[in-house]
Curated annotation (Swiss-Prot):
It comes from Nitratidesulfovibrio vulgaris (strain ATCC 29579 / DSM 644 / CCUG 34227 / NCIMB 8303 / VKM B-1760 / Hildenborough) (Desulfovibrio vulgaris). Its cofactor is [4Fe-4S] cluster. Binds 1 [4Fe-4S] cluster per subunit. Pathway: Amino-acid biosynthesis; L-leucine biosynthesis; L-leucine from 3-methyl-2-oxobutanoate: step 2/4. Gene3D superfamilies: Aconitase, domain 3. This is 3-isopropylmalate dehydratase large subunit. One of its GO terms (molecular function) is 4 iron, 4 sulfur cluster binding. One of its GO terms (biological process) is L-leucine biosynthetic process. Catalyzes the isomerization between 2-isopropylmalate and 3-isopropylmalate, via the formation of 2-isopropylmaleate. Belongs to the aconitase/IPM isomerase family. LeuC type 2 subfamily. Keywords: 4Fe-4S, Amino-acid biosynthesis, Branched-chain amino acid biosynthesis, Iron, Iron-sulfur, Leucine biosynthesis, Lyase, Metal-binding.
Length: 419
């Protein structure tokens, strides 16, 4: 049968013939990951099931990124427990401290995930790796414990929604605007347990970082995975990351889709997701006189070098409003060093930004940028649920890097084209 991207990848990892969506299959996994919040739960389940060793010490990644640098005693205990487990099991890919970054930026940078892989992680934004052509999805810690022990897990083959983006991207409109537009169109449950498959001329024009931004937020529409065909750009990215043997592939002609959507990007303008859901999407031009006290540029969604370049281009020669805290968090040490070499860090500092280490920090209301009652933030992160970044009486707007940077300058949510 003709396969969608999701079906094609899963077929490579199972001995069962995939013939239809809804089928239950057992698949071998390429990589299993967890972080400082979810790993301790997975480790507890791993031990409870009597497992003695991980299935492959080179295909488990434990990344201490959420509450690190450790913000309090409890966070330090979580990291200590995970560190000791990693050492006991001989896990190759344990990251903490100076070599650690936000997991969904770090693993692609290190070449640990790539096209055709099946990746499971105890983190909902594991779907990020779909930008590289991997079937990647978040699981609960118990299922991740099983995958760590067995090297396999089961899936219900998801139906696929194909989203086609045509046209040429205007200035200041990027991948974040595309995925927010899609989520705004279908809702936060519009792709519930569906694979989202992205294609079209505008998708082909995106770099791999932009594709990972879009795949990252597939879960915000309820998606099981967000998938891009692996093309020449993908292979170049993976080769640069040190991978070998990857091949290009796309969905089969004649593959059956549950639903097909089409968007012409040519006339698009920057958008924001307004409180308190990622589907409450409006053009920035329609969001009038909304003041912000905090701007966050970073996260597994938009903390890569291209995002920092975009933000720096807006901030260069300008100053952050005195009423705003602008927090910039490059997503990995490698990205931090590249930003330093390019002069981006100096640009941020000259503008009056706070430049911090690679951490999830404020995205989940963990630390390094918490909102007080009545405060409002615009962020390049992926969720804006009530209380997500601090107080239940605070608000979070989601945007791309250019819009966030422009808003830092003016102190109100601002279309960067108007500066």
């Amino acid at each position: 049968m003709a396969h969608t991207l999701a079906q094609k990848i899963l077929q490579r990892h199972t001995d069962e013939a995939i013939t239809d969506a809804g089928q239950i299959v057992r698949c071998r996994v390429s990589m299993v990951l967890a972080n400082d919040i979810t790993a301790p739960l997975a480790i507890k389940s791993f031990r409870a099931m009597g497992a003695k060793r991980v299935f492959d010490k080179d295909r488990v990644a434990l990344v201490m990124d959420h509450f690190t640098p450790q913000k309090d005693i409890e966070a330090a205990q979580q990291v200590k427990l995970t560190r000791e487990f990693a050492r006991e099991m001989g896990v190759t890919h344990y990251y903490e401290g100076g070599d650690c970054g936000v997991e969904h930026a770090l693993l692609p940078e290190l070449g640990l995930v790539g096209p055709g892989d099946v990746v499971v992680g105890a983190d909902s934004h594991t779907c990020t790796y779909g930008g590289l052509g991997a079937f990647a999805t978040g699981l609960g810690s118990t299922d991740v414990a099983g995958a760590m022990a067995l090297g396999e897990t089961w899936f219900k083959v998801p139906p696929t929604i194909r989203a086609t983006f045509t046209g040429t991207l205007p200035a200041y409109v990027g991948a974040k605007d595309l995925i927010l537009t899609l989520i705004g169109a279908i809702g936060v449950d519009g792709a519930l347990y569906r694979a989202l498959e992205f294609d079209g001329a505008a998708i082909e024009a995106l770099d791999v970082e932009g594709r990972m931004t879009m795949a990252n937020m597939a879960i915000e529409a309820g998606g099981k995975a967000g998938l891009f065909a692996a093309d020449a750009k993908t292979l170049t990215y993976c080769t640069t990351a040190g991978r070998t043997g990857d091949t290009a592939f796309s969905a089969d002609a004649g593959a059956v889709y549950e639903r097909e959507l089409s968007f012409d990007v040519t006339g698009m303008t920057p958008v924001v997701a307004c409180p308190h859901l990622p589907d409450n999407v409006k053009p920035v031009s329609e969001v009038k006189d909304v003041t912000v006290q905090q701007v966050v540029i970073g996260s597994c969604t938009n903390g890569r070098i291209g995002d920092l370049r975009e933000a720096a281009a807006v901030l260069r020669g300008r100053k952050v409003s005195r009423d705003v805290r602008c927090i910039v968090l490059p997503a990995t040490p490698g990205i931090w060093r590249q930003a330093l070499r390019e002069g981006l860090i100096e640009t941020f500092m000259e503008a009056g930004c706070i430049v911090g280490p690679a951490t999830c920090g404020p995205c989940l209301g963990g630390h390094m940028g918490i909102l007080a009652d009545g405060e409002r933030a615009i962020a390049t992160t992926n969720r804006n649920f009530k209380g997500r970044m601090g107080s239940l009486e605070s608000e979070v707007y989601l945007s791309g890097p250019a819009t966030a940077a422009a808003s830092a300058v003016t102190g109100v949510i601002t279309d960067p084209s108007t500066l």
